[in-house]
């Protein structure tokens, strides 16, 4: 089982020390062999991290192997092309370690289909050259007509390729465009929060990795991931196509509650394994908060080894 850490940076304290503390923790996690580091998008406070992909692009320069994921990325009010480009740059600067988890439509007070279209567009644009996309919320290029097929479509072969700079005055607008630069891999790790039913079903049917976040109770997360898996199985999708994530708090030698795995390190490892067995989750993410010095090392040495054995 993969094991990662996540952070939600917010508060009215100066951003510099808080951000530096998270970067230092990511560096420590990288040295300890954690699989992933997730930084959530936050808004509305002095220390908020409004652009987690940019934050993690810096983290890419001071780490070697840990995978870097922008978490809870909103699409409301954003330009889909820009969202795809920022993840591409994170992936390039990290030499293939970048990825993104999108927030659900419900958490943004927008239609779930708006999130679905952004994900579908980005995946198509990363994979191939010139495309166009027509949806209810996303159009690329913007002048794509209503007569275009829904979703992504691809430039037809017309017997000869003429570069755009040779078109001349008779034709100045491209109907299909390429997103450049391209990421290291055509399949950039892409996740979506499954805290609304419409997105859960859409993600299961379309092979998008599910993210059961810390705001869900453990019982709710397990129920939703298990339902995701049942739907995916029913349409012939395989578990190895996705990376199913369960995120939770951890209390080393502390009490368990609805949102927290607590107890001894052995108890915590057993509880996480139980949740994974019930859901076929492949990735556990600990929502990390400032705690006892050395807690990352202890978790790595006493819990992570039992999850990866």
What annotation goes with each model-predicted range?
Residues 1-63, 188, 289:
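N-terminal beta1-alpha1-beta2 module of alpha/beta enzyme domains
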Residues 16-28, 86, 194-201, 264-275:
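Short, acidic/polar
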Residues 27-31, 56-65, 87-98, 202-205, ...:
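Acidic (Asp/Glu)-rich catalytic clusters
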Residues 50-70, 121, 301-309:
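Alpha-helix-loop-beta-strand connector modules within alpha/beta enzyme cores
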Residues 79-206:
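Internal, glycine-rich beta/alpha segment that forms the wall or movable "lid"
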Residues 1-15, 170-186, 250-259:
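N-terminal small/glycine-rich loop or linker at the start of catalytic domains
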Residues 3-7, 37-39, 68-73, 98-102, ...:
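Hydrophobic faces of well-ordered beta-strands that scaffold small-molecule active sites
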Residues 114, 118-123, 221-231, 292-309:
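C-terminal helical cap(s) of enzyme catalytic domains, especially alpha/beta-barrels
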């Amino acid at each position: 089982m993969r094991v990662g850490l996540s952070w939600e940076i917010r508060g009215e304290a100066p951003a510099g020390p808080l951000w530096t503390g998270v970067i230092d923790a990511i560096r420590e996690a990288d040295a300890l062999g954690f699989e992933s580091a997730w930084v959530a998008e936050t808004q509305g406070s002095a220390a908020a991290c409004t652009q987690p992909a940019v934050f993690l692009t810096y983290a890419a320069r001071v780490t070697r192997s840990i995978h870097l994921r922008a978490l809870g990325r909103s699409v409301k009010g954003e330009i889909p092309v820009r969202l795809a480009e920022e993840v591409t740059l994170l992936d390039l600067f990290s030499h293939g370690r970048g990825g993104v988890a999108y927030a659900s439509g419900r958490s943004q007070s927008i239609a779930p289909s708006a999130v679905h279209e952004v994900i579908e567009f980005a995946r198509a644009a990363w994979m191939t050259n010139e495309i166009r996309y027509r949806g209810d919320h996303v159009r690329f290029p913007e002048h794509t007509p209503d007569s275009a097929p829904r979703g992504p479509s691809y430039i037809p072969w017309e017997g000869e390729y003429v570069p755009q700079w040779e078109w001349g005055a008779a034709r100045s607008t491209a109907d299909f465009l390429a997103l450049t630069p391209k990421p290291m891999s055509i399949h950039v790790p892409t996740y979506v929060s499954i805290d609304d039913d419409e997105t859960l079903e859409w993600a299961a049917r379309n092979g998008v990795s599910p993210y059961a976040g810390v705001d869900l109770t453990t019982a709710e997360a397990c129920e939703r991931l298990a339902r995701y898996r049942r739907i995916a199985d029913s349409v012939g999708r395989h578990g190895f196509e996705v990376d199913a994530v369960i995120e939770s708090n951890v209390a080393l030698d502390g009490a368990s509650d609805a949102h927290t795995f607590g107890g001894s390190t052995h108890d915590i490892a057993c509880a996480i394994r139980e949740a994974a067995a019930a859901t076929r989750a492949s990735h556990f993410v600990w929502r990390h908060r400032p705690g006892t010095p050395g807690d990352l090392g202890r978790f790595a040495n006493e819990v992570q080894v039992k999850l990866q054995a």
